[in-house]
A protein has these predicted regions:
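Phosphopantetheine-dependent thiolation modules in NRPS/PKS and related acyl-activating systems
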Residues: 2-79, 83-178
């Protein structure tokens, strides 16, 4: 960050602590939305951001491989999700696989026939599960080639992310879990 010192820059752990404030009125409303409403919102976001047809948006549709998302699209999708659902998404919570894996040497290893592939280690997989619980890391663990990691970002993982966010907001407000 420009103009900050290391002491001023929050760590990942600091930035991702449970909420220490009351939820906003928008967050409270969002926390009560049904799964169907979440799916509809994600559908609207992806149709607008990627120019795809609604019938392409199955739960398992991969953002890059199936829907044609490119790196710049992820930022657009993030902003549209925030606007659609009235929530703020801290940097790295929705799309941050590479950020997690490259943060620590213990989370990756080099391999392959020419030693030219990067694989996520067991420690890296565990870290991904903890930080990005909305992703299906177990399926990725069978072949943890980092080049395949973008396949973890699916329509379903985006809906699960919103469900996890709803749960955090309910916990923050003291409401009982659904």
């Amino acid at each position: 960050m420009v103009g900050t010192t290391d002491e001023q820059t929050p760590s990942y752990a600091d930035a991702h602590q449970p909420y220490a404030r009351a939820p906003t009125i928008f967050e409270t409303e969002f926390s009560s939305w049904t799964r169907e409403r979440l799916v509809k919102g994600i559908t609207d976001v992806l149709v607008d951001a990627l120019g795809v047809d609604e019938d392409e948006l199955t739960e398992g549709a991969r953002l890059e491989a199936d829907l044609g998302a490119e790196s710049i699209d992820y930022l657009d999708i993030l902003f549209r999700v925030e606007k659609e659902f009235g929530i703020e998404i801290p940097r790295g919570e929705l799309f941050s696989i590479n950020g997690v894996v490259f943060e620590d040497d213990a989370f990756r290893r080099v391999g392959g026939p020419s030693q030219n592939k990067i694989y996520v280690t067991e420690a890296g997989l565990a870290e991904l599960k903890e930080r990005l619980p909305h992703l299906n890391v177990d399926a990725f663990a069978a072949d943890p080639d980092l080049a395949l990691a973008s396949d973890l970002h699916t329509v379903g993982s985006m809906v699960r992310f919103l469900e996890f966010r709803q749960q955090k907001i309910r916990e923050m407000s003291g409401a009982e879990s659904a």
